[in-house]
């Protein structure tokens, strides 16, 4: 399943919903799942939940395994969430991803003994749309109920959040496609306001660590500024790091990331289960899409075949020049978390 497994690590695939609890109409048999990176010892560790990005269209493997290993090696027990996405606009997601991450936090706290974690040290780390998902939980946690009675009295509020090149606003600086995936092409004003996170920060929002690059051409850096300003006005502890240069989607910004050694064996589907099930449904004639669309998806995501190269060598050389500055974010975040999670 996952390359780079280390001796003493417990890797499990854990479905977060029972079949009868999960109702997204375009799931095609998929149930959201988390992958664990747990130290095989008796120590109680802080927990980290990773939410990869992908415009709410996919959960990117490049923002999954590598940050999970970074925090695992820093002493965290880590859970990477493959939440519900909307690849082909079959059905707006609405609040399903928010329900997914809320359930994940509650499940981890409920199983704190089993997972060897401290329930008062549960952080979340999201990238791009995954950061929007994490930010949504930070500002709307009180709104999210859970159908499972055992979880209803367990808090879903994270103790701290890392928002990496986050989608934040539905306003002037919005990443529009993320909001189309959530609400369709004709969202209501109420829906857009609810998911414009800078409008909903309160004193109860958990501490947040934000980072982004000035030259991000996909999600404007103003998204981070808007959320940081809202935190400042509400008295929420926060840190903000804006790096001078770098493309969108840098993940941990290492050479390993650049060469796409991202913990996904060639042709495997780690973090791409929903895409594979969609492709299989298309090829079986269970959707309105032409059958060749299924093969197109499998090629695009490298499932069952070699994935096309993401960059040319010349493009990689340009990206490589920006990595040293940006990759410092992981250590900065870990030091910040030690303060706000009171990690020993």
Predicted segments with their positions:
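Acidic catalytic loop of the alpha/beta-hydrolase fold
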Residues: 170, 215-219
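N-terminal cap/lid segment of alpha/beta-hydrolase-fold proteins
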Residues: 7-43, 172-177
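Short alpha-helix in the alpha/beta-hydrolase fold that links the catalytic acid
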Residues: 63, 197, 220-231
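Catalytic nucleophile-loop/oxyanion-hole region of alpha/beta-hydrolase
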Residues: 60-61, 66, 81-119
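C-terminal catalytic histidine-bearing segment of alpha/beta-hydrolase fold enzymes
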Residues: 91, 225-344
């Amino acid at each position: 399943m996952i390359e780079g497994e280390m001796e003493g690590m417990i890797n499990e695939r854990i479905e977060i919903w029972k079949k009868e609890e999960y109702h997204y109409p375009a799931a095609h048999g998929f149930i959201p799942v988390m992958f664990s990176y747990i130290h095989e010892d008796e120590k109680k560790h802080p927990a980290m939940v990773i939410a990869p990005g992908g415009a709410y269209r996919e959960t990117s493997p490049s923002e999954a395994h590598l940050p999970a290993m970074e925090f695992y090696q820093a002493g965290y027990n880590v859970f990477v969430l493959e939440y519900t996405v909307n690849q082909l606009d079959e059905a707006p997601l609405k609040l399903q991803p928010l329900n997914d991450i809320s359930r994940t936090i509650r499940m981890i706290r409920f199983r704190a003994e089993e997972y060897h974690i401290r329930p008062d040290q549960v952080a979340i780390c999201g990238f791009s749309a995954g950061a929007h998902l994490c930010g949504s939980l930070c500002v709307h946690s009180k709104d999210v109920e859970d159908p499972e009675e055992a979880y209803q009295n367990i808090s879903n509020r994270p103790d701290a959040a890392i928002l990496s090149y986050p989608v934040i606003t539905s306003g002037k600086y919005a990443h529009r496609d993320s909001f189309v995936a959530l609400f369709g092409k004709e969202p209501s004003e109420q829906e857009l306001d609810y998911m414009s996170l800078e409008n909903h920060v309160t004193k109860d929002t958990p501490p947040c660590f934000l980072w982004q690059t000035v030259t991000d051409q996909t999600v404007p850096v103003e998204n981070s500024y808007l959320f940081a300003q809202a935190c400042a006005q509400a008295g929420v502890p926060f840190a903000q790091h804006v790096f001078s240069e770098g493309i969108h989607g840098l993940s941990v910004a290492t050479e390993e990331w650049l060469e796409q050694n991202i913990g996904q064996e060639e042709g495997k589907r780690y973090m791409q289960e929903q895409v594979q099930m969609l492709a299989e449904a298309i090829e079986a004639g269970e959707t309105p899409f032409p059958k060749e669309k299924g093969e197109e998806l499998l090629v695009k995501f490298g499932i069952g075949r070699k994935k096309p190269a993401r960059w040319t060598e010349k493009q990689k050389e340009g990206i490589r020049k920006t990595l040293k500055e940006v990759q410092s974010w992981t250590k900065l975040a870990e030091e910040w978390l030690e303060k706000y999670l009171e990690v020993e």
